Every structure is written in structure tokens, then in C-alpha cells.
């Protein structure tokens, strides 16, 4: 990827400024379950340490996380102070049945529920953008599941004048 000019952010982040807006963009694989799961060997302590450092800024934080499971099922949006997480891995459920939805997703099993879309934290301040992506599993091809590339416009919050 680097030879094509991409900056791979694996347990790394960059602080950038675009049009006067200060952003922090980082990347992880995604085994970043909240602290309460660390004793269960389900979490990657290295990712948790990275996220503690990553979230320690006043900048708008954008995280690329290959795996969405910590964000969907384990209170990740509530636990971590990260404004927007972009994720995939679930392939939108690989096989979609009308009226039922996704049949199977990697690491989530049968009839997993939320497989793509935008999901918000309870207070509405943090967001997960989950893409069905372009990929297939090696065993089952996509069925009734159109590959997608997600495009998101990030715009600064407009502060209203106090009158």
C-alpha cells in the first residue's frame, strides 16, 4: 500500500488540519473491547493502550477499525471517546434474504442483525459508519448483497449565535 502512496495507520495516527479544522485520524484492526473485557482475553491490550492515547485530544477523532464487533456489541461507542469510527469486515451479511436480512457475518455468526449503516452512541455524539464493502468470503459468494463504497462528507459543526 505504501508503494501506491497510501499511509497505513496500523496502531498509528496522524494529526492533520484541513481548511482550519483539526482532525486526528488513526487505524487499528479492531480487537479493542472495553476495559471490562480485558480479563477475558477477548481484547488486545495493545489496541486498548493505543486507543487511550488516540482519544486524548481535543481534535475531531476519526478511527478506521477493520473489525466492527467492539463497536456494535461491546459498548465501544460508549466506552471510547472517538467521534467517528469507519469499519467493515462483515460484508453486509454476505447472503441477504428478503424480509430476513443478513444470514451470516464473519465473527458474528448466523442472523447477526446490524450489518451496515450508521449507528450512534446513546448520547448521539459518537458514530459508527459500517460498510458492506466490496469483498467476499472465500466460501460463500455474495447473494442479493450489492458491494459498496461508502462516501461521507464531514462538515464542521455550525455554532449558532447566542441571541
Listing of model-derived features with the role each one plays in the protein:
Residues 10-12, 65:
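Short loop/edge segments at beta-strand edges and connector loops
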Residues 14-16, 152:
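Generic detection of short hydrophobic beta-strand segments and adjacent strand-loop junctions
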Residues 1-6, 18-64, 71, 139-142:
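Binuclear metal-dependent hydrolase catalytic cores centered on His/Asp/Glu-rich metal-binding motifs
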Residues 68-153, 159:
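Conserved beta-sheet core of the metallophosphoesterase superfamily
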Residues 6, 13, 28-31, 133, ...:
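Solvent-exposed coil/turn segments that connect beta secondary-structure elements
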Residues 8-10, 57-59, 113, 146:
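Residues that act as N-cap/strand-start positions at coil-to-secondary-structure junctions
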Residues 49-50, 158-163:
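A short, highly charged, low-complexity intrinsically disordered segment
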Residues 17-18, 121:
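Acidic surface patches and DE-rich sequence motifs
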